[in-house]
Amino acid sequence: MRTSGEKLRSILQQAARLIYLKGFDGTSMQDIADACGMTKAGLYHHIATKEAMLLAIMHYGMDLFEERVMGPVKDIADPLARLKATLANNVRLVTLDSTKEVTIILHEHSTLTGDAKAEINARKKQYVQFLERSFEEAMAKGQIRKVDATLAAFSFLGTVLWTYKWYRSDGALSPEQLADGIGDLFFNGLMP
């Protein structure tokens, strides 16, 4: 028998799958209830509103970022090595592990309102600040040239996170090759 936490996780996984495929506005609570094999009333027993469900999915996605991207690199003292490991972990997360949740964070962030939006934005800001600090440390050590740390952080994120739009696991590059290639372009540039 499932615990209530396991049941909620199962509901959120089904909801994430549907929202990933149909978008938040295109997914009804009835769709989610049907996918979970329950009534809509039963679904509302676990989740109060559709926005609360979206918020829970986004929190789960941010938990994954913190656990799989930032967690393993936070104790790497060398800032350039930390940035390169962050890039590899982020590419892995986007391409292999949790594409649905990451896509939902990227596509549906403007759907949230009020406190829910502020909660997710605060968590996203922590990641940006982590990157900014890492770029600033790498500049201070002379590992990279002087650039605007905020511009570097958002360029990093744009480059890495956009891969979910075009990368295909059955394509020419493995996730590791993709991370190496993006890292080479990002940290070494295009010039010979």
Locations of regions flagged by a protein language model:
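Hydrophobic alpha-helical connector segments
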Residues: A56, M70-S98, A152-F156
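C-terminal peripheral helix-coil segments that are non-catalytic and often amphipathic
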Residues: A85, N89-L96, Q129-A140, T159, ...
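Short helix-capping/turn signature of helix-turn-helix
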Residues: I47, L106-L112
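Helix-turn-helix
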Residues: S10, Q14, L18-A52, A56
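Hydrophobic/aromatic residues within well-ordered alpha-helical segments
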Residues: K50, I57, G61, F65, ...
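Amphipathic alpha-helical packing segments from all-alpha helical-bundle domains
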Residues: D63-M70, I104, G114-A140, T150-F154
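N-terminal intrinsically disordered/low-complexity leader segments
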Residues: M1-E6
